[in-house]
A protein has these predicted regions:
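Short, exposed beta-strand "edge-strand" segments with a Pro/Gly-rich flavor and a Y/T-containing core
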Residues: 26-34, 62-64, 89, 196, ...
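Generic secondary-structure boundary/loop-capping signal
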Residues: 36, 51-54, 134-135, 139
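Short, flexible, solvent-exposed loop/turn segments with mixed acidic/basic and small polar residues
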Residues: 47-55, 121-123
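An acidic, glycine-/histidine-flanked metal-binding catalytic module
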Residues: 2-11, 19, 126-291
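Short secondary-structure boundary micro-motifs
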Residues: 2, 45-48, 86
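Intrinsically disordered, low-complexity polar/charged tails and linkers
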Residues: 1-43, 54-57, 63
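Long beta-strand-rich cores associated with HINT superfamily self-processing modules
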Residues: 63-183
């Protein structure tokens, strides 16, 4: 039974990983299936009345390298067959981590296999859903420590509010580090623009895994002669570009040239730049944006 659930978890994880890899995001992804002992414990402690069913029999965690990638993924995974979203509002007066958990339905073609694979004694207590948790790489380690050493043993922390607050303060420090890291790359991108290093500008602005080493000579020369186009790309909202790459399903060859041509299509619409698109690139962009 467990192996069949593992197979479903691997398939779901693979589909998510393929989508994120296609758009060049830097990430790690993990999945787990609740063991029968974990399931029994959770039902006894948290769902004793059985009015609320377990929704995270399968859990998937996406770990991003940058905090603003979470905004794109939250937007992307908030549409579709979503059952529940748990996205904490940030409170400037309180030290605590921000939860971003999204519960979605198991795809229809997997539901029967999912139900059959469940432990027979608990089938009525489990919904055909899975949970996606989104964290940054900095906060991932903190969450693992907090989950095992505080969340699972709350009685240890009774009367230790100052220590609990201090532990929350660690996540605040990590979040500050995340924002500082993002700011460093933003400043780097502006520095690159001012020195006409447009490949580095794109790399530091968008922070993606590109499939080429640099801009082509002809496009780089065109940007040097038309610096307003490079500046427009620098000022483009990264979230819009990432969401575009996520939501369109056709293949996209993520080179520096192709990204710049895509930005032009969705933001600038410079016809001279469109005229520079190689025939193969034009077909790819047309197919991608219509997918």
């Amino acid at each position: 039974m467990q192996s069949n659930l593992d197979k479903i978890a691997i398939q779901l994880t693979s589909e998510i990983s393929e989508s994120l890899s296609r758009c060049g995001l830097m990430f790690r992804i993990f999945s787990r299936v609740k063991t029968e002992s974990s399931l029994k414990h959770k039902l006894e402690v948290k769902y004793a009345d059985k009015k609320v069913k377990i929704q995270d029999m399968i859990g998937i965690r996406i770990v991003t390298y940058f905090h603003d990638d979470i905004d794109a993924l939250a937007l992307y995974y908030s549409v579709g067959d979503v059952v529940k979203k748990s996205i904490d509002e940030l409170d400037s007066s309180t030290f605590r981590p921000q939860r971003l958990n999204i519960t979605s339905r198991i795809p229809a073609d997997m539901v029967e296999e999912f139900k059959t694979a469940l432990p027979e004694n608990y089938r009525d207590c489990i919904e055909p859903t899975y949970e996606v948790q989104i964290r940054t790489v900095f906060s991932e380690g903190w969450h693992e420590v907090e989950h095992d050493l505080r969340y699972k043993c709350k009685e240890d922390w009774e009367g230790c509010e100052s220590y609990s607050r201090a532990l929350n303060g660690v996540i605040a420090t990590l979040e500050t580090a995340e924002w500082n890291m993002k700011a460093i790359f933003a400043e780097m991108a502006r520095h690159n623009f001012s020195h006409s290093d447009y490949t580095a500008m794109l790399r530091n602005k968008f922070r993606l895994k590109f499939k080429s080493e640099k801009l082509s000579g002809c496009l780089d020369d065109h940007l040097r002669a038309n610096t307003h186009l490079a500046e427009a790309a620098l000022n483009t909202d990264r979230l819009i570009v990432i969401c575009t790459l996520l939501t369109h399903k056709a293949d996209f060859n993520l080179t520096y040239d192709n990204l710049f041509f895509l930005i032009n299509r969705i933001e600038m619409m410079d016809f001279d730049l469109m005229a520079m698109e190689p025939a193969e690139t034009k077909i790819m962009l047309d197919t991608f944006l219509n997918s």
